[in-house]
Amino acid sequence: IRFNAKRPQKLALWPHYETYHATKDYADIARFIGLKGNTDEELAEAYAKKVIELAHECGVKLSLKDNGVTREEFDKAVDDLARLAYEDQCTTTNPVEPLVSQLKELLERCYDGTGVEEK
């Protein structure tokens, strides 16, 4: 949610959007479920936090580390995982076209659970 809610430098090729609207879409969802915010950006962040909160309430482990992946295993695989994610046909349907370096950064955050800590 957070990655796609930031205005991209380059839109994804598919589904050929002429304007970027992921932030507004997330804000609309946030409004629908009763979250508060003064801007679409604040509402998108409130929605991201709510999804994380719900995952914690359901007992979902939100990091690869907490799900048993060792740092050694992760470090060995992260470059290939980022490349494979970039090459996956579904990546082009993402609202934001990520760079391989951005995918690697997202994977690093997934390993550590950065940004999804329980409050």
Regions found by a protein language model. Give the residues of each.
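C-terminal charged capping/lid subdomain of soluble metabolic enzymes
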Residues: 23-119
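Internal helical hairpin/lid segments
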Residues: 1-38
